[in-house]
Amino acid sequence: NIAITYAYEPKQIAEEISLITEELQSRTVDITNMEQQGIDGNTDFNFNPVCVICDEIILMKLVFPDKLYKETLAKINAIIVSGRSKNIYAGLISQSGLAEYFGNSGIRGNIGLKVALGQMSASEYSMIFGTEYADVKNLRYGEIGSGLIMRTGLDSRPREFVAPYIKNHALD
């Protein structure tokens, strides 16, 4: 079963995030019950995957009422911090890596894949990849889809990344 929901109004987005947070809580209860029945906690519990993609997190901060933004961001943070073990994932897309758009900067340490496309400032690279990588540079700046990537558990530091470029007529 695959369900795709597209929400674009602040209230709709908040409702969808709330539903995913409820699913996260439900799976937490399910795991606790299974562990009490003697099922190993390191087992794959075969939960269907759930992915939430928050495109343009900056825009959320700008258009959401302040209280709704803070509540929604707290729920997104909860998904990022504890969702992976329950097969629930969050993707945050932003044109800026500045901390003011991501709330609690502690969530950045829990993000498993970080991609920075284009050329960013040293402070943005520092906020995305960590202070020890403030000096990294995208050497292919100007090339469409070029940037840096860092994958938790696979990369020891940001490395070059070029996203595939698909021309519109190639899809015809």
Where does each model-flagged region fall?
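P-loop NTPase catalytic phosphate-binding loop
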Residues: 1-33, 50-51, 57-129, 137-138, ...
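Alpha-helical multipass membrane-protein architecture
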Residues: 35-39
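Short basic/glycine-enriched coil/helix segment immediately N-terminal to the Walker B
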Residues: 41-50
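A generic structural signal for short, solvent-exposed coil/turn residues
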Residues: 44, 82, 141, 152-155
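Conserved P-loop NTPase motor module
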Residues: 75, 107-115, 143-172
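P-loop/Walker A phosphate-binding loop and immediately adjacent motor/lid segment at beta-alpha junctions
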Residues: 131-147
